[in-house]
């Protein structure tokens, strides 16, 4: 593993030993990238490089626009995704790929919760990622469904993965309770556009088996990886 920092972001890089393999950019918490990488080694998947980015200001870096708190004890989202994407594309991505022995065959982007929201949103801002995984993604986020339905992606992705826990929508919170319906509709929209997409329901709530759920999404992205 190679570790380095850019600004306040920490990057844990697990490089492939083979040349010209895919790179997956994962937005995650702390040392969760290592757990995801280990989980992927326990299942069959093609060789790839994992770049796990942590040290995020989740309510800022991962959100496309500002919204007020969605519950009494919550903090507002301040809509800094575009700003952070500039750092990702302009500094983090080049530094990651300077550490590789060869150029990647393609790039994917993945994330959990708000990181899953960001993964989908990024496809509308850059054509650098040809596959994405939104794992327990925050697709309850106000107006994101309407944004997706009314805007064009920078490039049609090869694969899109969505997953949720089957209890995530069972809440009284008026925002969070929409997550499964929104995700289902977004998934069906992409399928209607000819995108190879998968929507998977897992047992449990939002905070269950996150590394394994992320690994499942990345593993599916890597299938038929050419």
Where are these regions (language model features)?
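The feature captures the conserved acid-bearing segment of alpha/beta-hydrolase catalytic domains
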Residues: 140-211, 215-221
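Short beta-strand immediately N-terminal to the catalytic nucleophile in serine-hydrolase-like folds
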Residues: 106-111, 135
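The conserved beta1-alpha1 loop
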Residues: 26-30, 136, 164
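Short, hydrophobic alpha-helix immediately C-terminal to the catalytic nucleophile
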Residues: 38, 90, 120-124, 215
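A domain-start/cap signature at the N-terminus of enzymes
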Residues: 1-23, 48, 226
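Gly/Ala-rich beta-loop-alpha elbow adjacent to hydrolase catalytic centers
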Residues: 110-115, 119
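Serine-hydrolase catalytic machinery in alpha/beta-hydrolase-like enzymes
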Residues: 10, 20-101
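A conserved short beta-strand
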Residues: 128-140, 159
